[in-house]
Amino acid sequence: MIFTESTALENQKSDTPKLSLQYEQIATDTHTLRSLDWDRSRFDIEFGLRNGTTYNSFLIKGKKTALIDTSHLKFKNIWFEKLRQEINPTEIDYLIVSHTEPDHSGLIKYLIDLNPNIEIVASKVAIKFLEDQIHQPFKSRAVKSGEDLN
């Protein structure tokens, strides 16, 4: 299912960025929340993008509920609207942070505001970076490659 924030036509220039979301089940108890940024023209510096790009989050429900990554700040309104339709943010036990680039971590501060008890699971370096960026206390667990969460 696709949710959009912009009414701009695909070939029409607009001051409003063309943003949309897709929410899909990809496995039992696992869904993806895919943020589609149609206006992004570059990835890093060297890669041109003809059709924009996506920022992907994954919601996994089991004995505990984990969210892998958030999204870019520009998706804040529609991303949280859709997340709330699918789950109460206070029911998410873990936020697993794959890396701290803004397209994956841009909404972490706001998720912590909604769920102060969420545990951030990331590398030691990522946790330190988030502490320096967020400027508020949060629960965290530093993990290394190969470790299990549960």
Summary of predicted features, one role per range:
Residues 42-43, 107-108, 132:
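Short glycine-/acidic-enriched loop or helix-start segments at secondary-structure transitions
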Residues 2-8:
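Cytosolic, low-complexity regulatory segments enriched in Ser/Pro/Gly with interspersed Lys/Arg
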Residues 9, 14, 18, 24-28, ...:
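Metallo-beta-lactamase
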Residues 23-85:
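Conserved beta-strand hairpin/beta-sheet module of binuclear metal-dependent hydrolase folds
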Residues 63, 74-121:
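Active-site metal-binding motif and surrounding structural segment of the metallo-beta-lactamase
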